[in-house]
Amino acid sequence: MQQDDDPRSEKQMEFVTLVAGGQSFCIEITQIREIRRWSPVTLLPHSPAYVLGVINLRGAVIPILDLAAKLGFSTITPTERHVIIITAIEERIVGLLVESVSEILGAQTDMVRETPKTEEDATTRAVDGIIPVGDNMIKIINLDALLQSSLATAA
């Protein structure tokens, strides 16, 4: 009989690494539907600064958020060099504007470090953990926590 319950066997996870606000982040690959070039959005009146507008993606109206601004960094002025990551959490589909997408990062669960506890704020809740890679600290985005307040505001 094969034993898969070995406590020493760590779960392998895959992330898409990205840059937002000049910082390195990653999102679990299973939460990403597609990655596309920046395209102009339709503005929504009275939206928060991080809600850039909406796009029509194959018949679906998708809100586009500036990830850097949502995380408390300076807003991005979109150019053709920027990228939109279309994410899916449960039934929610949202586009995130980022500066760039780098690579796919494979990591064992034991590589993930706990996010240091500071004042409870949106940024702290939005980061699930940190993966040290060389001199770089890649923050894992908790899309569920990040999008919870954003979608209520954008709707």
Model-derived segments and their meaning:
Residues M1-A155:
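An acidic, low-aromatic, low-complexity terminal/linker signal
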